[in-house]
Amino acid sequence: MTSSAIRINKKPVVLSGIQPSSGMLHLGNYLGALKSFGRMQDDYTTYFMLANLHSMTFPQNPEVLRENTIRIAAQCIAAGIDPAKSIVFLQSDVYQHNQLAWVLGNVCIFGEAARMTQFKDKSGKQGNISTGLFTYPILMASDILLYDSAFVPVGADQKQHLELTRTLARRFNAQYGQTFLVPQPFECSIRIYDLQDPAVKMSKSSATESGTIFLLDSPDKIVKKIMRSVTDSEDVIGYDRETKPGVSNLVVMYSCLTDCTIEQTVNIYSGKKYSVLKKDLSDILVEVCTTIATRTNELLDDKNYIRKILVTASEQARGVAQKTIDRVYEKLGVY
């Protein structure tokens, strides 16, 4: 294992991240983001950010957040984010994120931020919301633009935020001259749904824990959750999100874990009962999650090693970010 600095080269930059507000990653995080990001590490300069500043948009227990950050870092590394290939850093350790966010906040028009559907959805469900929730997309834009990110993996819920980032980059460039690289989306089409309510995404905050496979779940829990997952009465394995959302969800999981296409998976299980697919999927998930859990526990036995990775990577990220801030401040006349 190594925590030495990653050599920055001329490969296109890909930036991704995850909030450590919960100490548990689930299957949706793994298949929808971590697995594909892990495969990018050889072909791109990859930054993976533990977005603890974004976690502050809702109240956090400081000690719990600190512990969860280490736990999430361990799980991400165990799931394939290699600190020898990626710059795995802590957002709060790179103060330039806040510096650029202030600049971009003065480039963003109030109405643009107010139109963000995620803000409208969350603010509609909460009572007293923070200004930080409103400015969340601006900080996200700062995260992306600081590192000259060429590509950003995004799901459907973040596409609007990335489009705002692109708008702000183009606006700044038009006003002050070429400064920012305008990032392109890597659209993540993989969506894993709740096992008990396949109309909604799998989430750490599902209505019932049985709807979510956590990467650190025990083998028994994984088997029970899969075998009890909602399907339908037809017992015909196929893929149709409208009429067969439950079994379609299982088909997607199997396909992602085995690198099969949807069509190949459906053909493999043609004429077989749901129980056969569930049994095979359970076996695969137990193997994958046990491997991740074992590695996670090894890493958590030496938390100082994880902290050293984050400190080293954050120092390197600051060096890159400062070059962007210097460029921006010079254009603005505040340097």
UniProtKB/Swiss-Prot annotation:
Catalytic activity: tRNA(Trp) + L-tryptophan + ATP = L-tryptophyl-tRNA(Trp) + AMP + diphosphate + H(+)
Binding site for ATP: Q19, P20, S21, G28, N29, G155, A156, D157, I192, K201, M202, S203, K204, S205
Principal EC category: ligase
E.C. no: 6.1.1.2
Protein's UniProt keywords contain ATP-binding: yes
Motif 'KMSKS' region positions after renumbering to this chain: 201-205
Pfam families reported in the protein's UniProt record: tRNA-synt_1b
GO BP annotations listed: tryptophanyl-tRNA aminoacylation
UniProt keyword annotation of Glycoprotein present: no
Main location: cytoplasm
MF-aspect GO terms: ATP binding; tryptophan-tRNA ligase activity
Motif mapping: 'HIGH' region: 20-29
Subcellular location: Cytoplasm
Membrane-spanning residues: none
InterPro entries reported for this sequence: aa-tRNA-synth_I_CS (IPR001412), aa-tRNA-synth_Ic (IPR002305), Rossmann-like_a/b/a_fold (IPR014729), Trp-tRNA-ligase (IPR002306), Trp-tRNA-ligase_bac-type (IPR024109), Trp-tRNA_synthetase (IPR050203)
UniProt binding sites for L-tryptophan: D143
Superkingdom, natural source: Bacteria
GO cellular component: cytosol
Keywords per UniProt: Aminoacyl-tRNA synthetase, ATP-binding, Cytoplasm, Ligase, Nucleotide-binding, Protein biosynthesis
HAMAP family assigned: Trp_tRNA_synth_B
Subunit description: Homodimer.
Described purpose of this protein according to its UniProt entry: Catalyzes the attachment of tryptophan to tRNA(Trp).
Family stated for the protein in its record: Belongs to the class-I aminoacyl-tRNA synthetase family.
Protein name: Tryptophan--tRNA ligase
Annotated organism of origin: Tropheryma whipplei (strain Twist) (Whipple's bacillus)
Name of the gene: trpS
